[in-house]
Amino acid sequence: MKSVEWFTWGVFLLLSGFGEAGRMGLGFQEKNPVFVKEKQSPFYAVPSNYEEVEFSSIVEPMYSGIATFGRLENVECLSKRSEDFDIAFIGMPFDTGTSYRPGARFGPSSLREGSRRINTKYGAVNVPLEINPFKSWAKLVDCGDIPVTTYDILKAMDQLESAYFQLIARKPSSFTDHDGFAKNDTVLPRVLSLGGDHTIVLPILRALHRVYGQPISVIHFDSHLDTWAPGLIGDGDEADGINHGSYFYFASQEGIMSKDANIHAGIRTPISSFSDYDDDVDCGFKIIEAREIDDLGIDGIVKKIRDRVGDNLVYLSIDIDVLDPAFAPATGTPETGGWSSREMRAILRGLQGLKFVGADLVEVAPAYDVAEITSLAGAQLLFDIVSMMVKYPLVKEADLSRYMPIHK
């Protein structure tokens, strides 16, 4: 015990009793003197050679800042209806229609976070599609999120339809002197929706039908059919029947999508009975199961999709659970045996040139993610979609050469 006390006193004397010599011996150095500039703030002192940093010349790191998709300009599109654009991203933070794991209401913010490395400042050339959509003829914006209730599904459907209609029923920034495919040969802007659960497609199709005036073909990437008749979940009334597994049934009943030119791809879910397939046929769908890629390959999958929709106007809907959970674990109803993110991107690129009127990516529930891999996969798919939309404007007989310096 005595030895410990003597050691403690020795250290104390070394640090304090020997003063300057002791401190210097232990490696302590005096700081350089600090001078206060004349008329400098009295609250702190600065070195005499201090210079202000010019932050306007510094490129913000890709991991910082407020996230928009691809660092696009955030525009209040719904409150400022005079704002024009060619392609907009809009968040739909709604997941009241989920039947299993909730959390897709946080999908829009997660997808924006996943797009940080795809941005206007650091470069965004889509090499396989040979285009940079952020440096082209198109004005791209991020319109933020639609304010939507989570307590009343019927009211939410009305809110989402109204907001989507307001976005697309305006003049675009470009091609205003061309003919388009909407009513009166009008060219309209296009919207990429960030879900949210898959129920959001019903109000989207309703709004699209109002402006295009014709049923639209649907390409639906998913592990589930989503054509359930009301009553499979819930009590069967409208408020209970509309959900992320039945919205296509309602769209078909309302006549707002094609009766014979829709297609699912990536299907692999168990079904309640074989009558589910009868309901699916009644909704105008054909099915490509996920396992078919083993025999058909990517080119075969692409051919079946293109043959089905033909030259129709097409709405593209992607449920992130079309991917295998190894590539996208953060979703509400994961199913094993899905496609890889590489396979999905290759299939998607095979659809370039189709007449896409809009698209969505849904069912990302980031609470279940690992290392952001689901958000990254979803953001990359959205990047491919917007690249195709820019590469192929939805106009009639346009001279694309003056708009597309690297278009092929």
From Swiss-Prot:
The keyword GTP-binding is assigned to this record = no
UniProt KW Isomerase keyword:
no
EC number, as in UniProt: 3.5.3.11
Q: Which SUPFAM superfamilies match?
A: Arginase/deacetylase
Q: Which reaction does it catalyse?
A: agmatine + H2O = urea + putrescine
What Gene3D superfamilies does its record include?
Ureohydrolase domain (3.40.800.10)
GO MF annotations, alphabetized: agmatinase activity; metal ion binding
Spell out the protein name for this chain.
Answer: Putative agmatinase 3
Which organism encodes this protein? Schizosaccharomyces pombe (strain 972 / ATCC 24843) (Fission yeast)
